[in-house]
Amino acid sequence: MLKTNFKFWRRAFLAVAISAQSQVFAANSDSGSEYPFVFHLIQAALWDEAVAADKTYFPPTYRQDGFTHGTANPDKLLTVANHFYQQTEGDWYCLRMTTESLRASGVTVVFESTAPVGDQPPDFEGSEDELYPHIMGGISTGAVLEVLTVERGEAGEFLRIHGLYPGE
């Protein structure tokens, strides 16, 4: 009897898990379709170091967060940058990728609600308006289509990402 109950509950658990997983994959397959790119804001020195060493880049909060944060909506980039990274000094880049270029490099992109970056909560205006691409691994240099420069003000505020929009 105990063996029969175990088999029943195991099957029930697997059925629920597979169903939930299918729903997540289905939701994620359409989530980023409105925007063709996945962007990642990165300290220039860290990216330059990864490129020079021909290594995959992992952000400083990767171990804590479990993924690399991204943004699909270009209109959200400066808001995200100013919320999470304004206090971090130095030059920054914005990496332009696609889910396909990331997948070709061996990582999956999952569109989910916002999540903390390290210990910084995602409580910026509009944080709950859309799903954000979470890159389930590091970023290889081959996954990046373009490296955009970021302009910052004297107080560290992020002002502009050069070349973000066509015709700039």
Predicted regions and their residues:
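Bacterial N-terminal signal peptides
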Residues: 11-21
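Conserved, structured core segments of small domains
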Residues: 30-168
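Boundary at the C-terminal end of the N-terminal hydrophobic targeting segment
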Residues: 24-26
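Bacterial N-terminal signal peptides that target proteins for export
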Residues: 2-12
